[in-house]
Amino acid sequence: MAALLSVGYTLDEIANDITGTTPACFEPSIDYCVVKIPRFAFEKFKGTSETLTTRMKAVGEVMSIGSTFEEALQKACRSLEQDHMGLGADGLCEYDDSSFADLVARPTPERIFYVAEALRRGWARERICALTSIDPWFISRIEDIVAAERSLRAGGVQGLTAKRLLAAKELGFSDVQIAQLTGQREDTVRALREVFGVRPLVKTVDTCAGEFASRTNYHYLTYERGDASEFEEAARPRVVILSAGPNRIGQGIEVDYCCVHAAMALSAKGFETVMVNCNPETVSTDYDTSDRLYFEPLTFEDVMNVIDSEKPVGVIVTLGGQTPINLAGRLREAGVPIMGTQPDAIDLAEDRDRFSVLLDRLSIAYPPSSTAETLDEAREVARAVGYPLLVRPSYVLVGRGMAIVYGEEELATYMAEATQVSPDHPVYLDAFLEDAIELDVDALADGTECYVGSVLEHIEECGIHSGDSACCYPPFSLSDA
């Protein structure tokens, strides 16, 4: 559109790509609310001040769509993939009482959660507005969420009627939050929703609130009392592709690139493609990249809502980086057909002990290594293997939580932080090979034939993750043989 305007066209001469029937000058009619939140990565920059200023500090962003501001805000909070399942009520509300007023007043990525906690503690709206300079309207909307939390906590599981569940869902509460507030498990809340028939509706982003027919399949899921779903039945078998979520240090457009090419390849094979993502900065979230696009958080609940609506013949979890891979096991347990690499094969590659056994069986050499769940176990490994050590959590891609430690003090610091990165899986420690050459080899194999796509040589020292480093193609240290 910008190109057409620049060469002299006027808005009334340009068609609206979304509807295909109205001109671009037609005033949009919006029946949804959009919330965007920046994604920060201060954990990658130790010692950097988290206070937000006019300097750009975000590394990515997320976007969510809902029928209400409250719903869109809570969906955006869980889209960030920073363990929050909404605006609090997820078991992460532990704040330093001595400096709490400063936490509320100071602009940081976490301040919105401190504001919600202040309302839980009974702070007046006016006091929060004075401290933060946030418009009272937004404080009132957060107050609505906090009031609903109190109601859910007071009613317990006995108070979870169909009406109250729907009311909570209209405010964006996830099953995890409702479970936390009522003392139940997430799967119990999900089962209760199924019994009551509390399910999200498929809605379309069409710029005209359904007044005109839309040519695009740009969707979001929302809970609306008494409204109709805009879901369309499939003409061909559908495949769901789970994309990567927000950009972060070590993971960016490369995984989105894989998802886009997967959509193209599947379309060429006669499938309808369904993309799920919450990152507005990507090609996968262009409305014309896939047959159907869902702007939804990449959590188990939200992904299952899409799958329940679309009923795909398969779901691809291996092209979107760590986030969809983390969902693979639960999706399989829920009976979802996984296409491509199966969850057990993913576990074989991610579980360091299982992978070491496989390497031993295949007589493939690898640096001395072991796993540890506690600092004492890590010290024992260090004594056996020796420093320096390359340490990283299990079940983590893209270099998150990876470090090189040269002594016991650094090891103790790492182990204290690693439990926050991956609390359910042990830390993997292996001998760090100094002055070694590191290569990235991309290959595709089917058990019979193997195709090597590229061999890249790292310019940085061995151990620097490929997402944080520069590479050279072709490799300059290898012979032609």
Residue ranges and their predicted role:
Residues 1-481:
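ATP-dependent carboxylate/acyl-activation modules
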